[in-house]
């Protein structure tokens, strides 16, 4: 088992920063690890016209923020396209006309290549656990197909308790293990932050790997240090090495 999947309780909860934290933490344990974002959407800059005109081109430009963060998080020499199968301008290509261009065979090949090259691959989803991946499959369906264990990124905000418990429940009902969850503080002004963490810890059987505070430009910082559950990280490292 060389791969695991990072899902989130919603969009915008910090899946990529949590993935960065896991990559950095496992690298400190001498694990050769890379991130993989199968489908990225919503670029920072407009795509070029010639890219839009080419129906075979899955890239408007190689500037999706999430993919770039994953690329910069690993110590391995990987290109943008090594760790991303599709980048789209549209924010939700899975439910637009673009969905017909997403071929899971390509995603599977890209994942297999990474898994054959590196010790561990951290696969980051898009949107939430049950979000569509293409015309036929959800991300959950695809993860079940590959029998990947799951880590849940929880953006700590109003409503996150319900979102987190539903996500964990769905993952477990589909027969996959939850290796742990990460609390990512996305609202510095949220009241009862500590109480929310306590409730989640009491309701989620999987261990809390760590709490990432609200910090400026986390994509440029060592966020792996916030994953303080080293015992569970060692367990994950051992499990993935089998």
Swiss-Prot record:
The cross-references to InterPro entries, in alphabetical order and at most eight, read: DTB_synth_BioD, P-loop_NTPase
**What are the subcellular locations of this protein?**
Cytoplasm
List positions binding ATP: 12-17, 66, 184-185, 213-215
User: Which residues participate in substrate binding?
Assistant: 41
Main localization, broad class: cytoplasm
Tell me which residues this entry annotates as catalytic.
Answer: 37
Q: What is its EC number?
A: 6.3.3.3
Q: Which GO terms describe its biological process?
A: biotin biosynthetic process
So what does this thing catalyse?
A: (7R,8S)-7,8-diammoniononanoate + CO2 + ATP = (4R,5S)-dethiobiotin + ADP + phosphate + 3 H(+)
Q: Please state which protein family the record places this protein in.
A: Belongs to the dethiobiotin synthetase family.
Purpose: Catalyzes a mechanistically unusual reaction, the ATP-dependent insertion of CO2 between the N7 and N8 nitrogen atoms of 7,8-diaminopelargonic acid (DAPA, also called 7,8-diammoniononanoate) to form a ureido ring.
Name of the molecule in the record: ATP-dependent dethiobiotin synthetase BioD
Record organism: Actinobacillus succinogenes (strain ATCC 55618 / DSM 22257 / CCUG 43843 / 130Z)
């Amino acid at each position: 088992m060389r791969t695991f999947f990072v899902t989130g309780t919603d969009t915008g909860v910090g899946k990529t920063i949590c993935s960065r934290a896991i990559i950095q933490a496992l690298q400190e344990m001498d694990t050769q690890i890379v991130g993989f974002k199968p489908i990225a959407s919503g670029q920072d800059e407009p795509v070029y016209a010639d890219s839009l005109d080419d129906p075979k081109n899955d890239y408007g430009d190689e500037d999706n923020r999430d993919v770039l963060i994953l690329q910069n998080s690993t110590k391995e020499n990987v290109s943008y396209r090594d760790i991303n199968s599709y980048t789209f301008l549209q924010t939700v290509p899975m439910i637009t006309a673009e969905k017909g261009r997403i071929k899971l065979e390509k995603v599977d090949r890209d994942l297999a290549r990474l898994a054959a090259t590196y010790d561990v691959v951290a696969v980051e989803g898009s949107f939430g656990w049950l979000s569509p991946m293409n015309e036929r499959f959800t991300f959950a369906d695809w993860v079940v197909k590959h029998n990947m264990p799951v880590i849940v990124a929880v953006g700590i905000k109003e409503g996150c308790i319900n979102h987190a418990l539903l996500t964990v429940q769905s993952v477990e009902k589909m027969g996959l293990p939850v290796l742990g969850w990460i609390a990512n503080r996305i609202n510095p002004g949220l009241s009862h932050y500590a109480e929310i963490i306590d409730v989640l810890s009491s309701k989620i059987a999987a261990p809390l790997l760590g709490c990432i505070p609200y910090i400026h430009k986390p994509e440029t910082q060592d966020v792996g240090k916030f994953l303080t559950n080293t015992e569970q990280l060692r367990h994950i490292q051992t499990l993935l090495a089998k």
